[in-house]
Regions:
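Glycine-rich beta-solenoid repeat tracts in large extracellular/virion proteins
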Residues: 50-60, 75-83, 99-106, 125-132, ...
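Outer-membrane beta-barrel strand-turn architecture
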Residues: 744, 785-789, 834-838, 881-887, ...
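Outer-membrane translocation/initiation segment of Type V secreted surface proteins
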Residues: 2-4, 13, 46, 52, ...
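Outer membrane beta-barrel translocator domains of Type V secretion systems
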Residues: 70, 93, 700-885, 997-998, ...
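Transmembrane beta-barrel strands of outer-membrane/channel proteins
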Residues: 750-756, 795-803, 844-852, 897-903, ...
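Outer membrane beta-barrel transmembrane domains
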Residues: 787, 824-827, 912, 916-1019
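Beta-strand-rich solenoid/repeat architectures in extracellular/passenger domains
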Residues: 41-47, 59-75, 89-98, 113-124, ...
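Extracellular beta-solenoid/beta-roll
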Residues: 230, 235, 239, 268-352, ...
Length: 1019
């Protein structure tokens, strides 16, 4: 603490100087006053001056309140230097035209104080310029510099800067250090035209509990700085909150009260880390500047944190660690390593509004919670001993190998285990609990027990809206016990019939539970959903049957809907009457323990073990009187085989009650009139095989099912034409927008083109044909021209609009249909050209565009509207050279190659008749390989240039659509040939016009013809 001794001073021409007597008294008298043997060498300044001051001779200096020391020239107003000074305090004002305060002390420990209300300022340089300081700098006042508020050179060491709650440090850069120091900020550090704090070298530690604010970055590290930040205050930057750009390891520790305004960027170092303690929320991104950049690790050691921004984690091993507390992530988290959740800790993905993504592995020994804001596919493999919960109402699709051994609780929404995915370990006793409002379905491998609570649903895969019927192994299979207190839903959402749900374990139903199925009510072998229980059944459940197109028929043994491998103790009852026309069906349990739908008032006898009156075994439950074995459960006395319980005219009695008129095999309760095989409840009138419920009147094979329709709806062609037109509407090459024959280095190009295209094609296996006419207007302009060491780079923007009209006809159908697409797009392009003047040498052209479309399909059946949107990007290369010739004109040859990626997302559409139109894939890749030959005048390159181009077009794009799961292709050939003829010339000194005609040809009667007009204006 400074001793406040009054000293006399006198003015010289340049400095305040203390006389020798005053100096001696100032050094000795305070010690005498406090009765100690110590001697304090101190100087107190109590008068203002415009003369720069040098603090070097005494141990302590104090500038009193209301005292101003200023300097009008480049010399610092106050300089603290030498090896004697131990303490200097400013309670007044230090103002310099150059630096305000210069500090250059020795190896001794020095304390510099800027008191409450005190000011240190500079109008042209640094307010505080520290060349060398070992010790502490405490600021409770204002430090305001034109350049830096405070600047610390490399010569400083073991320096700690404390900015108290009353302190403010401000400059273009608030505080800049080239040495490793400590910064404790309880006040404000402000960068008015740059960073608030920047560290270039050394190990710097920043503890911020108040405000750090920059117009560029809040805090940044550069060069070889090692920057450690502990933040419980606010760090903000108009560009980024924090920029870690040094090559050394930087750390960020966020504590309770932390607020970041702007992102945290990591680059150049692979070892930067983020740690969370206490509680808090952040919406900033913690990401890398370039691909491969990011944070080596993110560690949660706090109580509760929510991060809603994106995070790039580039470490290996356990690089995302949740050691304690609850961590919520609601952005895209890219993790090249593994995520580990410790016991008693939790990781939540999504915050109920935003959806999080997480890549890498996941070891869960605590709890993982899904609370996503939208439908979400989770591909990360989950291991460990922890539990998983889903609390949102959206759809979660698991596609990974999930071998965690804990329990799973589903509070809401839909959870899907997709084909190839795994949930649980074989032999595990873990349980998936499906609560009220939640649905669970699997097409993969589920090795857990399932507990369906009241209001919950265990569903077949295709019972979930949007899922298609799958035939892969493991679909609709549970390898564990099922306890059903809610609904076991087997009926497909699309009203199809034939699901087979398998429980490789026991089934227990409780009061109020239901099993819901679809059936086509008919004879014994009619299609139906089916439940297979390989274990035993207990309890009770209601069975709800929905008839799908069944006309009803008399059953013999019944339609089996539930089979049980073990003890069959469950009581199943119909939840509602089951009626098909005049036929009513009951649910009976046979002696084999299985359950059957039967159109009978009483159940059938045991169908597998009946008595034959002739002392023979009869497998069909019939009496046979001739002592012979009949495979359908009947005895045929005339030596004929009769498989269906029928009377055979060879003189044998068969109790199946059917007539068979002559040496024929008849498999079940049918009339067969002549030497034909009839396999199921059909009338067959002459020499034909009929396998499934159809009437066949002559010479044809009818297998009970339909192939692709012989007569196709013309709307199919309209949908196909619309999709193909939208996919290709705005795809273009460089020559479509730039045909300038001569160009100066600084010329920019404004352009516009109009193109028309007529395209016709057979599709759907030649069952539908359509033609499409497309017109496109595209406008754009360069906004940048940058000469390079080799060539020139130009870039620009573009926008456009287009319309496509399709007319579709179908064979054997008098109707037709029309399609229409109105499209719009915006995009950017860039071109590097080796020789811009004559467009010689190599070039690279790229563009990217976003497009959106309004689509219509009209016919005499329906008018349909639907939307789509897409993105496309292109890379094109070429190289042009001139064939040397002595003639006035010669040829310029230009081989070209182009690859285009197209993404078109068409909303799934269901028309008014229930026809569902869906796309199978959204991604397409197109290729072009060709050569262009231009015939130009050597002495006047601006003269008109005719040209010809030949191209090989590769890729048909995504040209398949599914209509009610029936895939139809537009049959666009994968390989097509293209011929272009055109001419380019100047309308005036700055305007060029290009005219082109083109044709394309390929398989499947594919043909396309087009015209193109381009105007280029250079300026």
């Amino acid at each position: 603490m400074f001793l406040l001794t009054q000293m006399d001073v006198y003015m010289s021409k340049k400095f305040f100087k203390l006389n020798n007597t005053t100096k001696t008294l100032g050094k000795i008298f305070p010690a005498l006053l406090i009765c100690t043997p110590a001697v304090a060498f101190s100087a107190i300044i109590d008068q203002s001056t415009s003369v720069p001051q040098d603090f070097s001779a005494d141990a302590e200096y104090v500038i009193n309140q209301d005292v101003t020391i200023s300097s009008a020239d480049s010399e610092a107003a106050v300089s603290v230097s030498g090896f004697k000074v131990n303490n200097a305090t400013n309670n007044g004002n230090i103002s310099g035209t150059g630096n305000g305060l210069n500090i250059n002390t020795g190896v001794q420990s020095v304390v510099i104080n800027n008191g409450i209300g005190a000011t240190i300022s500079s109008t042209t340089a640094n307010a505080v310029n520290i060349k060398s300081l070992r010790g502490d700098f405490n600021n409770s006042g204002s430090i305001i510099g034109a350049e830096n508020g405070m600047f610390v050179s490399k010569g400083s060491s073991a320096l700690n800067i404390t900015n108290t709650s009353n302190g403010m440090i401000k400059g273009k850069t608030g505080l800049s250090t080239q040495a490793g120091i400590g910064i404790n900020n309880y006040g404000s550090i402000i960068g008015t035209n740059g960073d608030a704090i920047t560290a270039d070298y050394g190990n710097t530690k920043v503890i911020n509990s108040c405000t750090v604010q920059g117009t560029d970055n809040g805090i940044s590290s550069k060069d070889t700085a090692n920057l450690d930040i502990l933040n419980s205050g606010t760090i903000s930057g108009e560009t980024n909150a924090i920029m870690f750009a040094s090559s050394e390891i930087n750390t960020l520790l966020l504590d309770t009260g932390s607020t970041l305004i702007g992102d945290v960027i990591s680059t150049n170092s692979k070892g930067n880390t983020l740690t969370l303690i206490g509680t808090g929320t952040e919406d900033s991104n913690f990401i890398g500047l370039n691909e491969g950049d990011g944070f080596a690790s993110v560690t949660m050691n706090g109580e509760s944190w929510a991060l809603s921004g994106n995070i790039d984690i580039i470490g290996s091993g356990d690089s995302l660690l949740v050691e304690t507390g609850a961590l919520t992530l609601a952005g895209d988290v890219s993790n090249t390593g593994n995520t580990r959740v410790a016991k008693d800790a939790s990781l939540q993905l999504g915050d109920g509004e935003k959806t999080a993504t997480l890549s890498g592995g996941l070891t869960n020994n605590g709890t993982v919670i899904f609370n996503q804001g939208s439908d979400f596919t989770f591909a990360t493999d989950m291991t460990g001993s922890g539990n998983v919960e889903k609390v949102d109402s959206n759809t979660l699709t698991l596609t990974g190998k999930n071998s965690y051994t804990g329990d799973t609780v589903l509070h809401g929404g839909t959870t899907l285990v997709s084909t190839g995915a795994t949930l649980g370990v074989k032999g595990s006793n873990a349980t998936v609990t499906v609560k009220n409002g939640a649905t669970f379905a699997t097409a993969g491998e589920v090795n857990n027990n399932i507990a369906v609570l009241s209001g919950g649903t265990l569903a077949a895969w295709n019972a979930v809206q949007g899922n298609s019927t799958l035939s892969a192994s493991g679909v609709d299979t549970i390898n564990g016990n099922v306890t059903n207190g809610g609904t076991l839903l087997l009926s497909a959402a699309d009203n199809s019939v034939g699901n087979n749900f398998t429980i490789n374990g026991d089934y227990t139903g409780s009061d109020g539970s239901q099993i819901v199925m679809n059936s086509t009510l008919g004879e014994d072998n009619s299609p139906t959903d089916h439940l297979t229980i390989t274990g035993s059944s207990f309890g009770q459940s209601g069975v709800s049957i929905t008839n799908i197109g069944g006309a009803g028929a008399q059953t013999i043994n019944g339609m089996e809907i539930v089979s049980i491998g073990g003890s069959s103790e469950a009581q199943l009852t119909l939840a509602k009457p089951v009626v098909a026309g005049a036929w009513e069906y009951n649910l009976y349990q046979h002696s084999d323990g299985n359950w059957y739908l039967e159109s009978k008032a009483t159940p059938s006898d045991d169908p597998s073990d009946d008595t034959d009156d002739g002392g023979n075994t009869d497998d069909g439950g019939n009496t046979d009187n001739g002592g012979n074995t009949d495979d359908g459960g009947n005895t045929d006395d005339g030596g004929n085989t009769d498989n269906g319980g029928n009377t055979d005219d060879g003189g044998n009695t068969d109790n199946g009650g059917n007539t068979d008129n002559g040496g024929n095999t008849d498999n079940g309760g049918n009339t067969d009139n002549g030497g034909n095989t009839d396999n199921g409840g059909n009338t067959d009138n002459g020499g034909n095989t009929d396998n499934g419920g159809n009437t066949d009147n002559g010479g044809n094979t009818d297998n009970g099912g339909n192939n692709a329709p012989e007569v196709m709806a013309p709307e199919v062609g309209a949908y196909l034409g619309n999709y193909l037109a939208a996919q290709g509407m705005f795809l273009h090459k460089r020559d479509d927008r730039d045909q300038i024959t001569f160009r100066n280095e600084d010329d920019l190009n404004t352009w516009m083109y109009v193109k028309g295209r007529y395209h016709e094609n057979d599709a759907g296996g030649d069952k539908v044909s359509y033609d499409t006419t497309t017109t496109v207007l595209q406008v754009g302009s360069d906004f940048m021209s940058k000469p390079m060491d080799n060539g020139i780079l130009r870039a620009g923007g573009m926008f456009g609009a287009g319309q496509a009209k399709t007319h579709s006809d179908a064979k054997h159908n008098v109707r037709d249909a029309q399609g229409k697409v109105d499209g719009f797009n915006v995009g950017l392009y860039a071109t590097w050209q080796e020789d811009q003047k004559l467009r010689l040498g190599s070039y690279v052209d790229t563009w990217a565009a976003y497009s959106w479309y309004n689509n219509k399909v009209t016919s005499n059946r329906n008018d349909e509207d639907y939307d789509s949107e897409g993105f496309a990007a292109s890379v094109e290369v070429g190289h042009a050279w001139v064939i040397q010739s002595e003639n006035e004109r010669t040829w310029k040859i230009e081989p070209q190659a182009q690859v285009i990626y197209s993404y078109l997302d068409q909303e799934n559409h269901t028309d008014r008749d229930g026809v569902r139109v869906t796309t199978l894939d959204n991604d397409s890749v197109f290729g072009r390989l060709g050569v262009k030959a231009s015939y130009f005048q050597q002495k006047d390159v601006k003269a008109w240039q005719p040209y010809v181009a030949v191209n090989w077009l590769k890729g048909a794009g995504q040209n398949d659509l599914a209509l009610n799961d029936e895939t139809v292709s537009n049959d666009t050939p994968e390989d097509r040939g293209q011929l272009e003829l055109g001419v380019t010339g100047n309308l005036n000194e700055t305007t060029t016009i290009s005219l082109r005609a083109s044709g394309e040809w390929g398989e499947n009667s594919y043909a396309a013809y087009g015209g193109h007009i381009l105007l280029n204006h250079r300026w």
